[in-house]
Amino acid sequence: MDGSGKTTQLALLAKWLSASGHRVFVTEWNSSALVKAATRMGKKKNALTPMTFSLLHATDFADRLLYKIVPPLKAGMIVLADRYAYTAFARDVARGVDRQWVRDLYSFAVQPDLALYFRVPIEVSIERLLARRVKLKFYEAGMDMGWSTNPVESFRLFQGKVIEEYERLVDEYGLHVVNASRSITEQQHDVRHLVAAHLGETHDARTGTDE
């Protein structure tokens, strides 16, 4: 969810894993050179419909899966994805796209070994986002849906629907919930504990964010 702090947590996790001797590769949502320019242009003109948005993100994901996710995995690296197919499952459905259609669209996706959901209240998310910039972005706030002309209120309505879908995914796909309302250090402790357990390694509870 926007404003949950997941990007910060992923960066800290990558640093920790690398320091522990692991080879790490990080990939971000909507970062494929193949479609990034088209997505940026569509956003600039406010021309993206829910279906178009969904298809563009699926194309981005397919391109990155082929060139940025599978190759590092085959090379024995740990791949950290800042957002995964679950992002589409939540956002696209919140925009009214058929739930099963979206899942079928991403049927080619590799099942991740570990998926984290950074759960954060909407008001905390808004506070964090507005602390970094003057206003909420058009699509980030769900303004394309026409639910409200007020960006903050639109964000509440849109992200409320997104949260409903993420909560559904927790049980459906076994997402691990991280309480993103807590401090960066506390969150990172939990994240490292989950990852270390999956890797079959021990984790020092005293580990901080600066290691």
Predicted segments with their positions:
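Conserved lysine of the Walker
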Residues: 6
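Conserved phosphate-donor/acceptor-positioning beta-strand/loop module used by diverse small-molecule
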Residues: 82-83, 108-132
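Conserved nucleotide-binding/hydrolysis micro-motifs of P-loop NTPases
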Residues: 31-33, 85-86, 120-126, 183-184
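Hydrophobic positions on the alpha1 helix immediately C-terminal to the Walker A/P-loop
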Residues: 9
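Structural signal for short hydrophobic segments within the conserved structured cores
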Residues: 25, 114, 176-178
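ATP-dependent small-molecule kinase phosphotransfer cores
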Residues: 16, 20-110
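Walker A (P-loop) phosphate-binding loop of P-loop NTPases
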Residues: 3
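NTP-dependent small-molecule kinase module
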Residues: 14, 127-211
